[in-house]
Amino acid sequence: MTDYKATLNLPDTAFPMKAGLPQREPQTLQRWDSIGLYQKLREIGKDRPKFVLHDGPPYANGTIHIGHAVNKILKDMILRSKTLAGFDAPYVPGWDCHGLPIEHKVEVTHGKNLSADRTRELCRAYAAEQIEGQKSEFIRLGVLGDWSNPYLTMNFANEAGEIRALAEMVKGGFVFKGLKPVNWCFDCGSALAEAEVEYQDKKSSTIDVAFPIADEAKLAAAFGLPSLGKPASIVIWTTTPWTIPANQALNVHPEFEYSLVDVGDKLLVLASELVESCLARYKLEGTVVATTTGQALELINFRHPFYDRLSPIYLAEYVELSAGTGIVHCSPAYGVDDFTICKQYGLSNDDIISPVQSNGVYVESLEFFGGQFIFKANQNIIDKLVEVGSLMDTETISHSYMHCWRHKSPLIYRATAQWFVGMDKQPESGETLRKRAVKAIEDTEFVPAWGQARLHSMIANRPDWCISRQRNWGVPIPFFLHKESGDLHPRTVELMEEVALRVEKEGIEAWFKLDASELLGDEAAKYDKISDTLDVWFDSGTTHWHVLRGSHPMGHETGPRADLYLEGSDQHRGWFHSSLLTGCMLDDHAPYRELLTHGFVVDENGRKMSKSLNNVVAPQKVNDSLGADIMRLWVSATDYSGEMAVSDQILQRSADAYRRIRNTARFLLSNLSGFNPATDILPAEEMLALDRWAVDRTLLLQRELQEHYGEYRFWNVYSKIHNFCVQELGGFYLDIIKDRQYTTAADSTARRSCQTALFHISEALVRWIAPILAFTADELWQFLPGERNESVMLNTWYEGLTELPADFEMDRAYWERIMAVKTSVNKEMENLRAAKAIGGNLQAEVTLYAEDSLVADLSKLSNELRFVLITSTASVAPFVSAPADAVVTEVAGLKLKVVKSGHAKCARCWHHREDVGVNPEHPEICGRCIDNISGAGEVRHYA
């Protein structure tokens, strides 16, 4: 038998079938670095419109986890797609460097007896070390960025910029000193931001406490009685027994009805709706003597259960009837509502009783409980209430309670002297911060859209922002306070600039080593230099002001503005939140035009990642086992608007999808062997109809993908690219062209037409996948024929695709109908192969029985219909002539019949043809193959 292999155009490419991503990706990173890819992108983007994504800085502590990887990959996909869309899309990565976690790490390693200066020195060194580790892990994900020049909140320039931002806020009238209850962690020894609070279940003792009446006549009058006749008490219910020593008032709702209840030996005041449940709890029987409104009880004095002081009734609308007694005990030092109500009733800061120290221990001078830790004192307080006869009931409940996100320990509200940004404080000019922020939210685009309502609710209801902390490792609040009046120095803003200039040169250490006389001269003796530092959310929240300024051509009249902030959904209460507030104070608008949030990563069962559950997916391990491109593909395929499920099995499915895309790319490359686009490319009008359709279909898909990329809908991008590779290419077009590619003359119009289409498709596809499969796209780029620059990223979306003319006979709808017919034929072929009636499609001869309109469509392909159906013979007949055993298809007006060919198989093209062996010189091949080998070659028009 003659070997005709040498006469075929067999596919050939050096592009490897096996990706070997864990080994090849680090080499690609080295190549990007050696060619200066990021710098080249900035050079070619100089005259392009800018797109600025401002990086929310991760905390410089520990190795990266899967959530970090998701965040950085999403950012990279957006910026790569924007680059391909013709924007200059720089990426300046950042790190959040100050704050308690780093200080805590240093204390654990070096002990707690370090000097403040030494602590700062070690914290700075630790943060720098952590940044280097995280940086290499982010780079390994394929994230393009200015990694040599990241912004760090501990860079001297940024520390100085933060001080200048604070000075602007002071100048604008937003900052004030106040005594207010703030979230307080005993382990941190500091106030916490709202974003640093998490809620966990906690067991607490509830107590019902009777406060005896101090003014019997007023209470009797309030209930319309001439006298009480018995001892009377009002009963409160609380879950925090430790706050009873700090009680200073009692709250009732002005509109609720309250009852005076006779329980035998005494009278109790309770909310009318709760009398029955309270008496049941106290195991008492009673009769309602009289009722009144909360309003009538205002300012009536009761006595503290065990201290010699009064507790007046204050009206408060926050009182509820969902639990307890309808009366709330009020400790202004340990509750936000308590504090607010007491201030409304004229209680001064000096009047507020605050016996709990920063470590959670009562001051020694507190009678009965001095020196005790508050949570351990709960039982002693209960015992004291029993002793004085004021305890009505105690129970243990489990309820959601605020905890420190770092130490997981319970928090309290604690009134301390702190620096605040006022949400409703009238600034020097313009609207209040709350009004500005609400308006800014309305002017911002949100992805997903529900983020807008979430952030709006948080801003509408949040308290003033406590910006001060009592720690060493943080940007200082460089204030001088008058020793007698407590007022800020009149030249505070000017002095802050002098401090900023020093910090710019020496870092925050410049403030801490500064002697007040260096700035204040003889005035220094009259002022205290404070040691408070700024909340770390102020650090990251002001980066837009000093990092972004000057980076964007739009919005500079009123300050910088990023096109996009992108972080996890927890940042509505974190970075999005603090950045919004600082932006509205400094520039009167949000520092972003659009906010994108992604969900948290969970396992395939929706559970949080946890070492105890053994379900942690570490990005480092994924890189080493599957490759970063597989992780990137998983990110793209997952709808990030909700929780993002990942597991080894899910990643394996991504790896399978990756192989299908890679195999498609390899098929394209292997069939471009010998193709030189400079000399072999055909104009659209000379291409075969099917090839023109394939290019047109690619153009339509590119438009869809550009839209999806623009809307950050990467899961749509992924699914459409995957379907295009597997179905429209792999399941239709690429199958059909194999015969033409392999069997026609190497430089025939039929083959060059197909190669032209494959070239256009490849040029488009490599760009489509570049934002997602960053490494693979760059590898593919190196194997494409023709002269090209060093990286796919140095280009924009492919512009060589052509659209079918409006009057083209074989238009898009035509090929849709042909595809439907081919699908029906394939289905019947599968049935026959399963029944072993035929071995392969080319053993088949198919007859299509069609209605007139479909006959017209099919007849347009003439004798090339068999190449589209991939059968040795294909004929068309009227629908009415279909025999009884013809198969009814899903295509309206189409039946078909497939029979096994009785003709010999061509040894070259494998078609079963009647003319195999007709030529004695080539007895094993068909006439078409003889013509392609030694004749003028077959002519194709359509497929």
Curated annotation (Swiss-Prot):
Keyword check for ATP-binding: yes
Binding residues annotated for ATP, in chain numbering: K611
Subcellular location: Cytoplasm
Residues at which L-isoleucyl-5'-AMP binds: E567
Cofactor(s) the record lists: Zn(2+)
Principal subcellular localisation of the protein: cytoplasm
EC number of the protein: 6.1.1.5
GO molecular function, one term: tRNA binding
Residues that bind Zn(2+): C906, C909, C926, C929
Segments carrying motif 'KMSKS' region: 608-612
Motif 'HIGH' region per UniProt: ranges: 58-68
CDD domains according to UniProt: Anticodon_Ia_Ile_BEm (cd07960)
Cited InterPro entries: aa-tRNA-synth_I_CS, aa-tRNA-synth_Ia, Anticodon_Ile_BEm, Ile-tRNA-ligase, Ile-tRNA-ligase_type1, Ile-tRNA_ligase, M/V/L/I-tRNA-synth_anticd-bd, Rossmann-like_a/b/a_fold
Keywords for this protein: Aminoacyl-tRNA synthetase, ATP-binding, Cytoplasm, Ligase, Metal-binding, Nucleotide-binding, Protein biosynthesis, Zinc
Endpoints of the signal sequence: none
Cofactor binding remark: Binds 1 zinc ion per subunit.
Gene Ontology, cellular component aspect: cytosol
Record remark: domains: IleRS has two distinct active sites: one for aminoacylation and one for editing. The misactivated valine is translocated from the active site to the editing site, which sterically excludes the correctly activated isoleucine. The single editing site contains two valyl binding pockets, one specific for each substrate (Val-AMP or Val-tRNA(Ile)).
Similarity remark: Belongs to the class-I aminoacyl-tRNA synthetase family. IleS type 1 subfamily.
Function noted in UniProt: Catalyzes the attachment of isoleucine to tRNA(Ile). As IleRS can inadvertently accommodate and process structurally similar amino acids such as valine, to avoid such errors it has two additional distinct tRNA(Ile)-dependent editing activities. One activity is designated as 'pretransfer' editing and involves the hydrolysis of activated Val-AMP. The other activity is designated 'posttransfer' editing and involves deacylation of mischarged Val-tRNA(Ile).
Protein name: Isoleucine--tRNA ligase
Species of provenance: Pseudomonas syringae pv. tomato (strain ATCC BAA-871 / DC3000)
